[in-house]
Curated annotation (Swiss-Prot):
Gene3D superfamilies: 3.40.1350.10. The gene is yraN. This is UPF0102 protein YraN. NCBIfam families: PRK12497.1-3 (NF009150), YraN family protein (TIGR00252). Pfam families: UPF0102 (PF02021). One of its GO terms (molecular function) is nucleic acid binding. SUPFAM superfamilies: Restriction endonuclease-like (SSF52980). Belongs to the UPF0102 family. HAMAP family: UPF0102 (MF_00048).
Length: 131
């Protein structure tokens, strides 16, 4: 598990949206430092939203960013439920269609970047359209 730099818990002073935006920006920077290329953020389609869309080589990566102050109740990664996965898959399918693609024609994966306290966990290929 990677450590994130200590900056205090800024989420206490921010609105839920501001805190979410801050964690998504941190996730983007962290993923870019690992070699992924930014494509889009906060992509909304009917029925859902994708936090980040990145490119890892030729693979389109749909990223769900989660933050929890502590690991109590399972931590950040545990909050990506089957229902949330279904919404992400649906949203990605719609986004790909707008790009003239599909799961059959574009190499894709779904990652979860989980911030729990000061720890980062990167779950590559956390789920897929066959789950």
């Amino acid at each position: 598990m990677a450590q994130i730099p200590a900056r205090g818990d800024c989420s206490r002073q921010l609105t839920r949206k501001q805190a979410g935006d801050a964690w998504e920006a941190a996730a983007r920077r962290w993923l870019e430092s690992k070699g992924l290329r930014f494509i889009a953020a906060n992509v909304r389609e009917r029925g859902g939203e994708i936090d980040l869309i990145m490119r890892d080589g030729k693979t389109t990566v749909f990223v769900e960013v989660r933050y929890r102050r502590s690991g109590l109740y399972g931590g950040a990664a545990a909050s990506v439920t089957h229902s949330k996965q279904h919404k992400l898959l649906h949203t990605a399918r719609l986004w790909l269609a707008r790009q003239n693609g599909s799961f059959d024609t574009v190499d894709c994966r779904f990652d979860v970047l989980a911030f729990t306290g000061n720890e980062i966990e990167w779950f590559r290929d956390a789920f897929n359209d066959h789950s």
